[in-house]
Amino acid sequence: MCLPRPASTDAVGVRTALLESRLCTVFPLRFDDLEAMQGAYKSASIDDFMDMIQPHFHALDASAAPLSLTTKAGPAAARMAAAPPWLRRLTECIARYRTVTVHDTLSHPIAMLLVVSSSGPDPLNAFAQLYEASKHAADTDILRCYLVLHDTATAGSDVSRSLALLDEVKRTYGLQCALLPINSGAGAGTVAADLLAAEWAAPDLRRAPHASGPTWPGALLSTEDIARLRTFVRELVTKSLVPYLERNEQRLNEQVVSLRRGLANRLLGAGRKLFTARPPSPGYDAERDEYPPASVTAQTRRLADLAFHVRDYRLAAQMYDAVRRDAVTDHATTYAAAAGEMLLLTRAAMAPAASDLDALLCAVCEEYAAIPGGRLRLLRAAVLYSNVQRQTPRYESVAHALLRGALSADEVMRGVLLEGAARAYLGLPRPHARKSAGLLLQAAAQYELCAQKTLARACLGALAAYYDTCAWPALHDHVLFHLARLAHASGEISEALTFLVRLVHPAPLAETAQHMDELCEVAKYADTLRCELPTPMWIAAACQIKKASEWPRTAQKGA
């Protein structure tokens, strides 16, 4: 298939379990190959994630709004507080990289699209094989849609055979079937291929990047093919996926309410003591740390995910909270943390100004930190929560979340999060310049360790301008010295000398010696050495020429 992996459909109407209508301005989708989904059923560590995203950060530059720690609150501060490109890139990578686990059922696929070409030798048998393969890769009640592809480049424009195949597929598998003609373009380099290039340019962290040239996806598509693709995606959402989600949410809502009411009645009948300190709920397997799919907690989590998909945030928050309380009682830390993460995001989407959201974030991060391999999930929860709060915007919560994520990050990722927190502090009604400066110092040091010289110099340049106006000479000298070293490492000798010359002033002996040694080292490589010291070495008005006979006698004896 030539569907873009991250796709979306605009203006989709959904209906909640209480029959309330909602309009989704954007209904996002993600298409993954079956092999990629099967390979994702393993816990990924933060080291694996860093190895995957490292190539995407080689081309980072300082193209964001320049930092100024002295800017007052207003539009300029809001522009600086906006997420820089490298933080947006990190957020996109984290959002796309969601491993499939039993504890986080939101990562499970909600539908399966089985695609077979009508030009194959036995299309019906191919559908049967795909159906059997999909039974082991998804939930039992998943939506399955069947798509017959008519490849115009190989089968011609006559679709009679494909239509006959479509009728046979409908009789066998039901009405969730469609026919899609593709590849009617003239060849590679068409306008249609260029239209899809931007959608395929987004990095897919589960697969190797596609090569350019005639093998580029969509090379034979025409503009009519692209229009048919987009129409198919919209009909898939509005006529198949959304009705499936709505039906299952209503059905599960009735089941879960009945099950939980019956469980509560049994517990209350046994007495208050049993209700307040009950044993693990039936169905929880403590040895495998797993809730069976038929258990009350698993069904509640499934209902919460369905409600989240149809934007029924109130019901989703109630169900995530119930799952979290069950998991905490059963000492299922991984389930509790996963439900807490979704409860955090759901409540932030409902009421971003709630006072207890930051406390909930801290609790979720502590639970993830206690789980083996939970650092990546901690990072994802913090970054996604900060992204939700940035839309409000609530910059103090954004900074708090990014700092929590930086505690579990390494290398360039930590620098990105620290700089994002520093920028967020500048967006407050009363910008916290000192906090921002301290975080920028840490971010610059982290960038320097990771050889991200451009980003480090951008942070240090803002700090140098800020400390010029403050009475902190030691910090100012520290920033200038590191700017000089970065300029020297980049081969900009004259700029390095400019920074080092500003360090020639009265200072402690150890620091002065270090600065002078660096100045002498850099001066060796200067083509022309012309620099003006901040303090002149010779003050002509205060100099006198005296004969030796005019010296004091004590000076003559010493000589």
Over which residues does each language-model region extend?
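Extended alpha-helical assembly domains of large eukaryotic scaffold proteins
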Residues: 261, 265, 269, 273-558
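Eukaryotic intrinsically disordered, low-complexity segments enriched for acidic and Ser/Thr/Pro residues
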Residues: 1-282, 433, 438-440, 453, ...
